[in-house]
């Protein structure tokens, strides 16, 4: 979405990654809420729905809000299960894996077919490869997500990954987020 620019003269020293992005171990999660209804929302949907997120094997279940995100992947003919924005409605506890997080991008499986799991793995691997080239890159954390309806019925279990927020990338590198304009419409690219 945006890039980081040279640090201001009073820049703080670089910070370590927050707990969620400090490891490459796969996290097993349960996201409960009307995810199935949200996924059917379409490209113009601005719906925000309540839900919960919990790390499997932990007693901590945190309240969240879920919304669709992305541009092309929100189109029904592209993805049946578009990427999600996960917003914590209260700050996660200090000892939590999600400590210090407020809003996260969750890259999802897009479609149920196994081929789409492989596409997602390739996209995740691209982020990890870029991390090897430069610290000025988004960290990603692979997750195995059990999606469950608000009533508790299983929807699907698929891999996905969280992306580090841009302001955390900047802070981790002793920089700040660059303020850039809106997207350029495709029609203006010639």
How does the language model describe each region?
Residues 2-190:
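Phosphate/dinucleotide-binding and metal-coordinating scaffold of catalytic cores
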């Amino acid at each position: 979405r945006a890039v980081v620019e040279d640090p201001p003269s009073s820049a703080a020293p670089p910070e370590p990654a927050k707990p969620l992005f400090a490891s490459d171990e796969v996290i097993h999660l349960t996201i409960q809420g009307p995810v199935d209804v949200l996924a059917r929302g379409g490209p113009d949907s601005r719906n925000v729905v309540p839900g919960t997120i919990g790390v499997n094997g932990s007693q901590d279940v945190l309240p969240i809000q879920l919304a669709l995100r992305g541009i092309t992947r929100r189109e029904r003919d592209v993805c049946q299960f578009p990427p999600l924005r996960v917003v914590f409605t209260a700050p996660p506890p200090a000892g939590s894996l999600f400590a210090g997080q407020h809003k996260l991008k969750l890259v999802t499986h897009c479609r149920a077919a196994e081929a789409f799991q492989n596409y997602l793995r390739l996209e995740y691997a691209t982020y990890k490869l870029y991390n090897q080239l430069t610290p000025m890159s988004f960290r990603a954390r692979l997750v195995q997500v059990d999606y469950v309806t608000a009533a508790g019925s299983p929807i699907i279990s698929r891999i996905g990954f969280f992306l580090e927020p841009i302001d955390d990338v900047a802070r981790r590198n002793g920089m700040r987020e660059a303020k850039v304009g809106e997207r350029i419409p495709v029609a203006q690219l010639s």
